[in-house]
């Protein structure tokens, strides 16, 4: 079956070209220094490139030091979340890990025997605090609060399938819009903006609702591109492209159409909210600053789709999506961590069985 991610439509003004600044090796070195990655480990180096590359799609026009901050956020997201999602820890140990990370953001200190992700979190927190200074404590607090909320969302989201059944789509979306990690990206962008805008703007219900809509769309895009990986990892129960098929007894193509229609609904509602929100601003400087934030919301969607089409984390020669199969075929055969190689090995195993 051939589906196309290009069925997802959004305004052409949301299109982007990835940031061309060189920064990935610098984040890798930082990951080595902070104990996230292992020295002389090719798998770690490739993993770093795969996950950190996302920031050049989310922040395609920022300067180097800000792109580094975006790269650190991606490094922290993936290394902290993947360890918990792997199911390596008991509930008690997981609760302790979450509490430790919360304290890093709240207090700006490291616990005893800090982990690599905890050190990355403190490094990013410190940079944000310096950039915000004394004049923008509200911005800084919004950033660290959004990070804590994301950390606290991981366990509840994973527990939503405790009864062995997929959640209702509405409940799934409500939990996932925090768990997807869009809010820390937005608040980090506010830190980068070095804004002179009044703080009350970020509490406007239209702005908050716009953020929620974007988070839901990013969630659904991520669910589409990760479909095959999650089914292969026995986690399809938490992927709506999969669980809508089983709940509604429909084919993959029909499930995909339903999700694309949902994406278009949320984008349409977002556009209407954005138009109303922009009416609040009258001066050219205000409009320029708020456009920087709006562009980032747009890039979270367009960048997520564009990155997902080419990252070895998701592409596969057996993907239901044309673009992901095509890009898998163009990968070097030596990229042994790619999903292409993984899916080929899986196919061979199934054939032997």
UniProtKB/Swiss-Prot annotation:
Short sequence motif NDxxSxxxD/E motif: positions: 222-230
GO biological process: terpene biosynthetic process
Keyword Manganese annotated: no
Gene responsible for this protein: TPS1
Taxonomic lineage: Eukaryota, Amoebozoa, Evosea, Eumycetozoa, Dictyostelia
EC number: 4.2.3.160
Cross-referenced PANTHER family: TERPENE SYNTHASE, TERPENE SYNTHASE 2-RELATED
Classification via InterPro entries: Isoprenoid_synthase_dom_sf (IPR008949), Terpene_cyclase-like_2 (IPR034686)
Catalytic activity: (2E,6E)-farnesyl diphosphate = (2S,3R,6S,9S)-(-)-protoillud-7-ene + diphosphate
UniProt keyword terms in alphabetical order: Lyase, Metal-binding
Disulphide bond pairs: none
Chain positions of motif DDxx(x)D/E motif: 81-86
Family in the record: Belongs to the terpene synthase family.
Written domain comment of the UniProt record: Contains several highly conserved motifs that are important for catalytic activity including the aspartate-rich 'DDxx(x)D/E' motif and the 'NDxxSxxxD/E' motif, both of which are involved in complexing metal ions to coordinate the binding of the isoprenyl diphosphate substrate in the active site.
Pfam families with a match to the protein in the record: Terpene_syn_C_2
Protein name in the entry: Terpene synthase 1
Gene3D superfamilies the record matches: Farnesyl Diphosphate Synthase
Keyword Metal-binding: yes
Role played: Terpene synthase that converts its substrate farnesyl diphosphate (FPP) into the sesquiterpene protoillud-7-ene.
GO terms for MF: metal ion binding; terpene synthase activity
